[in-house]
Curated annotation (Swiss-Prot):
It is found in: Cell membrane. The lineage of its organism: Eukaryota, Metazoa, Chordata, Craniata, Vertebrata. Residues 1-25, 80-100, 159-195, 259-269 are extracellular. It holds the Pfam family 7tm_4. Disulfide bonds join 97-189. It comes from Homo sapiens. This is Olfactory receptor 4K2. It comes from the Eukaryota.
Length: 314
C-alpha cells in the first residue's frame, strides 16, 4: 500500500457475526466459555506431557506443540471479539488488521505442517516399526517442529507483504470478526479475480494438497492396521482415527475458504468460527477421549494435585 493511501485509512470496522444485541450477548457467553475451555484443555495436555515421563515420546512431543499452536490460534482474534461484544467497540487499526492476518496465517500454516509431521510419525510407527527409533529421533522431532514454524513464518510474511501492496478505497468495513485476506480483499480497489487467484495459489492449493497427502497416508496406515488384530494395532487405529478427525476438522473449513475466496461471507464467517474457535477446543477432547495413556496420566496428575493440597497445612 502506498503511503498516501495508508494515511487516509487508519482503521477498519469489524462487523462481527451479527448486529443483533441478543445474539451478540449469546456469542459473548458461548465464545468466552469456549475460549476458557480451549486454554484449560490444551494447557492440561502440555502440563501432563511435561510432568509424566511415560509421555516423553515423539508423538506426545508433537501433540504438545499442536496444543501450543491451538492456544495461539484461539488467541489471535477471539479475546478481541469477546471484549468487542462487551464494549461495543468494533474498530481495528490498519496495523492491527495486518497483525491479525500475520498471526492467523502463521498459526494455521504452522499447524498444517505440524499435522503432516504427526502423520509421518504415525506412518513410521505403524508401517515401519523396526525403523521407528532410528527415523523418529528426538533431533528429528525438534527439526520437524522448527521447520513447521519457519514455513509458517514464510507463508504469513507472503500474505502480509501482498496485503501491504493493496490500495483501499472504502467503505472500510470488514464483514467478519477478524481480519483475513478473503474479506479484506473485498475492500481493495483492484480486480478481485486476480486477488482470488492469489489466495487460491498461496493458500487454497497448499491446504488441499497437504490434505490429500495426509488422507493418503492415513489410508495406508489403516490398511496396514487392518491386517493385524493385536492390541497394539487396536491402539494404533484409535490414535490414527483421532488424528484424522483433527485433520478433517481443521482442513475442511480452510480448504473451502481459500479455494473459494470470493464465496458467501456468511458461509466464510461460520467456517472461520469453526477452525479458529471450535477446532482448538475440540482437539484436546478428541485426543484425551481416544487415548488411554493421556487419560491415565491426567488422573495421576489430578491425584498428585489433590494429595499436595491435603498435605498443605491449613
Amino acid at each position: 500500500m502506498d503511503v498516501g493511501n495508508k494515511s487516509t485509512m487508519s482503521e477498519f470496522v469489524l462487523l462481527g457475526l451479527s448486529n443483533s444485541w441478543e445474539l451478540q450477548m449469546f456469542f459473548f457467553m458461548v465464545f468466552s466459555l469456549l475460549y476458557v475451555a480451549t486454554m484449560v484443555g490444551n494447557s492440561l495436555i502440555v502440563i501432563t506431557v511435561i510432568v509424566d515421563p511415560h509421555l516423553h515420546s515423539p508423538m506426545y512431543f508433537l501433540l504438545t506443540n499442536l496444543s501450543i499452536i491451538d492456544m495461539s490460534l484461539a488467541s489471535f482474534a477471539t479475546p478481541k471479539m469477546i471484549t468487542d461484544y462487551l464494549t461495543g467497540h468494533k474498530t481495528i487499526s490498519f496495523d492491527g488488521c495486518l497483525t491479525q492476518i500475520f498471526f492467523l496465517h502463521l498459526f494455521t500454516g504452522t499447524e498444517i505442517i505440524l499435522l503432516m509431521a504427526m502423520s509421518f510419525d504415525r506412518y513410521i510407527a505403524i508401517c515401519k516399526p523396526l525403523h521407528y527409533a532410528s527415523v523418529i529421533s528426538p533431533q528429528v522431532c525438534v527439526a520437524l517442529v522448527v521447520a513447521s514454524w519457519i514455513m509458517g513464518v514464510m507463508h504469513s510474511m507472503s500474505q502480509v507483504i501482498f496485503a501491504l501492496t493493496l490500495p483501499f478505497c472504502g467503505p472500510y468495513e470488514v464483514d467478519s470478526f477478524f481480519c483475513d485476506l478473503p474479506v479484506v480483499f473485498q475492500l481493495a480497489c483492484v480486480d478481485t479475480y486476480v486477488l482470488g487467484l492469489f489466495m487460491i495459489s498461496t493458500s487454497g492449493i497448499i491446504a488441499l494438497s497437504c490434505f490429500i497427502v495426509l488422507f493418503n497416508s492415513y489410508v495406508i496406515v489403516l490398511v496396514t492396521v487392518k491386517h493385524h488384530s493385536s492390541r497394539g494395532s487396536s491402539k494404533a487405529l484409535s490414535t490414527c482415527t483421532a488424528h484424522f478427525i483433527v485433520v478433517f476438522l481443521f482442513f475442511g473449513p480452510c480448504i473451502f475458504i481459500y479455494m473459494w475466496p470470493l464465496s458467501s461471507f456468511l458461509t466464510d464467517k461460520i467456517l472461520s468460527v469453526f477452525y479458529t474457535i471450535f477446532t482448538p477446543t475440540l482437539n484436546p477432547i478428541i485426543y484425551t477421549l481416544r487415548n488411554q495413556e493421556v487419560k491415565i496420566a491426567m488422573r495421576k496428575l489430578k491425584n498428585r494435585f489433590l494429595n499436595f493440597n491435603k498435605a498443605m497445612p491449613s
